[in-house]
């Protein structure tokens, strides 16, 4: 069972990742985690959100141009993918499914970071305890960006802001305060 399908040509289709049963919470998790890889006999598997968009916005007969070149992924590039944690109580749901019963809709990208206090001339690793996670709880710290100015040479209060966007578009932002104090 697949929630959304759109015929490209002949037996080839765009379709959402299949479910084991005709229930939205019975997603084939292992197959979902293959999104972005060759995993089909010619069809193009998509998240529910993307397959639904095609069905809602592309009338029958819409011309389809498929890029099959790893060195040139086309004008939009190859999208990033999110992985579902195997065995998680919500792993039967596609995290992009807009169904109000989808438990992933209560989750989002998040950043964990704490304020820092140190003395003049005692540098600390501002990024040591900063972690970013996607909607499904996967570590995406490497995708995080930051901005702000600080120095360990002048007493004062400084702010650094961390931002991240996960593969399904969920965003998180966290600001920390860095307090530099005079030596005792």
For the regions a protein language model found, what residue spans apply to each?
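Exported/periplasmic cell-wall-interacting domains
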Residues: 1-107
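Residue-level "contact hotspot" at macromolecular interaction interfaces
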Residues: 57, 117, 151-152
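Well-ordered beta-strand positions in beta-sheet-rich domains
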Residues: 63, 115, 173-177
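Solvent-exposed, low-complexity, repeat-rich "mucin-like" stalks and linkers
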Residues: 106-138
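Serine/threonine-rich, repeat-prone extracellular segments and beta-strand-based repeat modules
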Residues: 138-180
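Low-complexity, Pro/Ser/Thr- and charge-rich linker/hinge segments at domain boundaries
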Residues: 183-184
């Amino acid at each position: 069972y697949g929630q959304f399908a759109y015929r490209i040509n002949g037996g080839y289709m765009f379709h959402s990742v299949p479910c084991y049963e005709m229930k939205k919470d019975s997603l084939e998790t292992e197959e979902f985690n293959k999104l972005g890889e060759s995993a089909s006999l010619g069809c193009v598997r998509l998240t529910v959100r993307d397959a639904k968009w095609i069905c809602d916005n592309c009338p029958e007969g819409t011309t389809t141009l498929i890029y099959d070149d790893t060195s040139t992924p086309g004008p939009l590039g190859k999208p990033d993918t999110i992985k579902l944690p195997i065995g998680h109580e919500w792993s039967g749901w596609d995290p992009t499914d807009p169904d109000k019963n989808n438990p992933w809709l209560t989750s989002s990208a998040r950043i964990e970071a704490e304020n820092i206090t140190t003395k003049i001339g005692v540098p600390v690793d501002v990024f040591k305890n900063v972690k970013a996670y996607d909607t499904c709880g996967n570590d995406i710290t490497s995708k995080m960006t930051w901005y702000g100015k600080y120095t360990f040479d002048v007493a004062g209060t400084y702010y650094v802001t961390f931002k991240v966007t996960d593969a399904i578009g969920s965003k998180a932002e966290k600001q920390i305060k860095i307090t530099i104090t005079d030596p005792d």
